[in-house]
Structure formats: C-alpha cells, structure tokens
C-alpha cells in the first residue's frame, strides 16, 4: 500500500519544523514536499500533526526467550510500535543468552517471525553473561549482533573488559555497559540517600556507578574502542563522561526518561513500581543529567523498557525485581515534562530519540529522507490523556507514572511503509 500524508509538519535537515506532505511508495519515502499529488496512494490528512522519523531505542528488554511470562517479542514490539518506536535494540539477558551461533540464530528466527518493528539484538560479551569466558564476537557479528554487552550486570573483571574492547574495536563494533561495581552494591534496592535512610533500606551509592564508568573509560582509551554507557544516573558519572569526551576518548552515553523526570524526592512510598536499576537518585543528580543532555555529554535517550509481572512487583521493594516498562509512556512523558516546561525544545527531543541514537551506532534510520525505508511516527502534540497501564500492549504494567496526565501521543506508526499500529479514530 502507498500512502500520501497531507498537511503535516516535520523536522527538516536544518533542524526546523516546517509544513509538508510526505509520500510513501513501495515501503520507502518517495517524496517530502508541499502540495504533493499522487495516483494509487491512500490519502491521509494528518491535519497539522507531526510526521516524525520512527523513534529509535537502543536499550530494551524483550524477555524472550525464557521470560515470556513478562514479555514476548510480539507483545514488546507491539508496545514499541504504540510508543512510536520503529527500531529497538534488544538486550541479551534472556535465557538462553545470545552468546553462541545456535542461540543467536534462534533469536533471529524468533525476531523474523514475531517482531512488528525492527529489532536489532545485542550479542553477549561473555558466555551466559557470567563474566568469565568471552563469546565469539566474529560469529555473533556475522549473525547480526548490533553491539556487545552483558547488560543487567557489569563486567567485573577489568582484563576481560579490556580484551572485549580490543576485539570489538577490530570489528568496528561498540561495547555497551551496565556500570556497577559489585563490591559497592551493598544489597541495595534504592539509591543511598534520603529515601533509603528514611525507610531503613539498603542503598546503592552513586559511586557504585561512576567508579565503574571511570574504569571502563580508561580501558576504552587503551583499546581505542567505542564505549557506550547505559542509563547514566549520577552527577559524578556525568562529570567523568564529560571529561573523557574532552580528552577525545570514544565514549557515548544514554539516559532514561524516568531519570530525567523523577528523582528520589518523588518516590511517594515503598512502591516497587519506583524500583529500577540504576535507582532514582538525588535532585542534584537529576539536574546534572539534564545539563549533560543539553551540553552533549549525554548523547541519547533510551527507555530501558523492563517489563515484569504484577506478581513479581508485588513482592515488596526489597524482593521485587528492578525495572519499569517504558515504550508506551516515553514520548508523552518527555514532551510534557521537558518540552512543555521549556527545558529542551521539541526539535531536540526528536533528535535525542531518532537521529542521535542512529548516528551513535551508525544506523541508517532516524531521519526522514527520500529513498529511505518509511519508518515513520505520526505524533499528536495536542492530545492529552492520563497514563493508564491497563491499556498497555506490553505485558508489563509496571510503571510509576500511572495517572499522570501527559500531552503529545503517537497516533500512527509505520515500519517499512506498513502501518503497524494506529490509534482508533486518530486521523478521522
């Protein structure tokens, strides 16, 4: 099916939002201009809505294989489509781990059969993510590994991490890291700060993250490797990454919507839906993350979509698993709490969720360009509604944002020119 989107707006190559029509033919963007006419195309009047590149999320947990009670490739990618994401990068903490030819081939087969959006799988750095035996990077790359990570745990052995970085550098691939020094975790379930002290809980100190990042940055410099830091959460981490960039080290970083929007002061009670890793930090950490995003220290926004069952989250804050679901709330949360409040511009938000993650990892997506695959999201910036987990397409309903009133919602998502999700009556 060919589509002609009329009376829209889009972010042009100069970084300005302007009026446009957009023609999709044979799965690709055929033309971007005003007053397009075309035969054999279904005309869709978007009535001033924003025609955006499909959003790109480089940090997601789809749980399949092994955790299908939490999420599946099918439900997770439907949730991604509803959230406006057309390309997502799946972390390897599944069972089995994509750490071998057999396991990666099985994962790719599942993706091909079940995914509603583009899914790029990470390859594990170590076998079973156990930290002791390196995987075959060359084979995993040949089978489509997006990059290498043991996300969910930090690689504790410095010699292992250095060897992994050297091997990845030879393959022109990135090493992506969840940064925690295990000896400093302290069996924590929240940030070591006011909230942990008030409720008598073990806390995870900020230095647990920043010291691991500092180590890895020096290793990356020695290996001349592209090193990407997952879900940065502390002021100290931002400072370390900023200094590394100034020194010319090839480091990039991401931050989550929840760390930009919340801090420990916003946790209302010992609610496990506010339990994530890294935890919500102090107010000054939150402010440093926003500053780092604005000055280029932090490159992109990624959701760290981490679905769990209601039963798992009901175990209490100390026993419940870390993580919150993120696909279906990311854009409206960020638009409402950052753009509408004047903290960042709409143009910046679109870039942090599209072209910047694509550029960081060399992906040919993230921009609306003639001739490229028609991965597109239509956004209604005027629409306002409350976040309701019962409407999530994800199996995971675990969110701290239930009941939040947000503005700016995806209403249609196309992948390769095919409509994979549409809000009922959104464009009527």
Curated annotation (Swiss-Prot):
Example GO biological process: purine nucleobase catabolic process
InterPro entries given in the database record: Amidohydro-rel, DHOase, DHOase/Allantoinase_Hydrolase, Dihydroorotase_CS, Metal-dep_hydrolase_composite, Metal_Hydrolase
Pathway(s) the chain acts in: Pyrimidine metabolism; UMP biosynthesis via de novo pathway; (S)-dihydroorotate from bicarbonate: step 3/3
Residues involved in Zn(2+) 1 binding: 59, 61, 151, 304
Entry cofactors: Zn(2+)
Function: Catalyzes the reversible cyclization of carbamoyl aspartate to dihydroorotate.
Protein name: Dihydroorotase
